[in-house]
Amino acid sequence: MSILSFLLGEKKKSASVAKERLQLIIAHERVGGRPPADYLPALQKELVAVISKYVHISDDDIRVSLERQDDLEVLEVKIEIPQA
C-alpha cells in the first residue's frame, strides 16, 4: 500500500484481499501449520459470504478441497453460479 492510497483512504478490492488470505493459508500450511480440515470449512463460509454480496448462492453451491500429490498441493474451489 502506498502512502498516497493510505492518505486518500482507498480500499483494497475483495479479490486482492482474498488472494492475500489464500497466500497466507498456503504459506502457513507449507511451514507445518494446522491440517487443512481446520481452515477449509471456514474458507468455504467466507467465500459464500463474499460471493453472496453479488450473486444469490447457498453453501451447497461452493466446494473447496485441498489435494496433495508428492510435493504439489492444489487448492480447488468449485463455484456453481445460477444463470440469470
From Swiss-Prot:
What is the organism field in this record? Burkholderia cenocepacia (strain HI2424)
Instruction: Report the Gene3D superfamilies cross-referenced here.
Output: Cell division topological specificity factor MinE
Specify the protein name: Cell division topological specificity factor
Tell me which family the UniProt entry assigns to this protein: Belongs to the MinE family.
Biological process (GO) annotations?
cell division; regulation of division septum assembly
InterPro entries per the record? MinE, MinE_sf
Origin: domain of life = Bacteria
Q: Which gene encodes it?
A: minE
Which Pfam families does UniProt cross-reference here?
MinE
| The UniProt record lists the keyword Cell cycle | yes
Q: What is the annotated role of this protein in its UniProt record? A: Prevents the cell division inhibition by proteins MinC and MinD at internal division sites while permitting inhibition at polar sites. This ensures cell division at the proper site by restricting the formation of a division septum at the midpoint of the long axis of the cell.
Keywords of this protein's UniProt record, alphabetized?
Cell cycle, Cell division
